[in-house]
Amino acid sequence: MRILVVDNYDSFVFNLVQYLGQLGIEAEVWRNDDHRLSDEAAVAGQFDGVLLSPGPGTPERAGASVSIVHACAAAHTPLLGVCLGHQAIGVAFGATVDRAPELLHGKTSSVFHTNVGVLQGLPDPFTATRYHSLTILPKSLPAVLRVTARTSSGVIMAVQHTGLPIHGVQFHPESILTEGGHRILANWLTCCGWTQDDTLVRRLENEVLTAISPHFPTSTASAGEATGRTSA
């Protein structure tokens, strides 16, 4: 299986790559201005799935990101957008991305979802780590994108295309404080043709819980996560 991660110059993109590797996937990583992305249609045709990473700035300034969304849509290639990549999906289909009601950098929120797509099998709500100042504006969302997760205040946390294998999450599944990060990626990989190993996914989830529990008890985990992330 060939999976491409488009790196939007995010400081923690290799956490995503590591999670994929733990699921048995050796992803290729190309920067968003890599010359190989100039033929987006060819790229969409040669990979089983494309992941658009988080990163700083706006979708329009994230190299080939928006063009890759169009190419994957045309080829029906499974696509997952994370944070900035999620916003690129919105822009590609006509939504407006603008300032979020609150600026969050390394803070956790409860996310309420519809238990479909990449979020299937997660607790409702689940805890997710957020690093963003921009968001897809709900009133601008086109009919082809449906909201699959929100915060309690209504900020869009995930979208899914109504007819294509295209998914976006505003939060960061690769953060150690996000519940079910491996499961989210595993759910997406099944769209790409991967046979899900639920025993493996549960083991990885338990390893994350074991690693953080001595340092981030439930009462303090929501206080946030201090990192040097550069995401928008």
Swiss-Prot record:
PROSITE patterns: GATASE_TYPE_1 (PS51273). It catalyses: chorismate + L-glutamine = anthranilate + pyruvate + L-glutamate + H(+). Its EC number is 4.1.3.27. Disulfide bonds: none annotated. Keywords: Amino-acid biosynthesis, Aromatic amino acid biosynthesis, Glutamine amidotransferase, Lyase, Tryptophan biosynthesis. L-glutamine binds at residues 55-57, 87, 133-134. GO terms for molecular function: anthranilate synthase activity. Residues 2-198 form the Glutamine amidotransferase type-1 domain. Was identified as a high-confidence drug target. Heterotetramer consisting of two non-identical subunits: a beta subunit (TrpG) and a large alpha subunit (TrpE). NCBIfam families: PRK07765.1, trpG_papA. This is Anthranilate synthase component 2. The gene is trpG.
